[in-house]
Amino acid sequence: LNERTESYKDILPQLTKLNEQAKQPLSVETYKGKNVIRIALRDIINTLKEKGGIVLCTAIEESVPFTKNKTIVEQYERDLIHFKIKERVIIKQGDKGLFHKGTSKYRKIPKKYFNPNPVQIYGDNVQTIVWGNPDYLIIIRNKNVADSYRKQFELLWDQASKE
């Protein structure tokens, strides 16, 4: 009996941790239309402006949102500077990053691995934009999902080139 009690004591912290992870709130929001860029960028700023943080971005072809919403993208860069929010951005080889005022660091991956639908990871959130007619924005709000995407980003960041 004592052996069983000891073995339960050993696994109890792991079970408690799993139970807490299962309780993490999860929500999925979808948007469509011409305002998805404004909604996406505003949500990033609103999430990180108080506590700070970093935005991890994959598959960003920055010319697309810039062409569609120049004013909104310029405001986003001003907000990054004002609220001291940093970005790490993965773009395709041959592209140049748009932001060069110290807010963003860029790395590049070969074009054959590039997917034109951007993913942004920030706080406990993950965004995906699907370009089309209309454009779509999907926001997943969950710490575990965000952490999972963060790990994938770090793997890709480590493999991407600085030049």
What are these regions (language model features)?
Residues 136-163:
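Signature of lipid phosphatidyltransferase scaffolds
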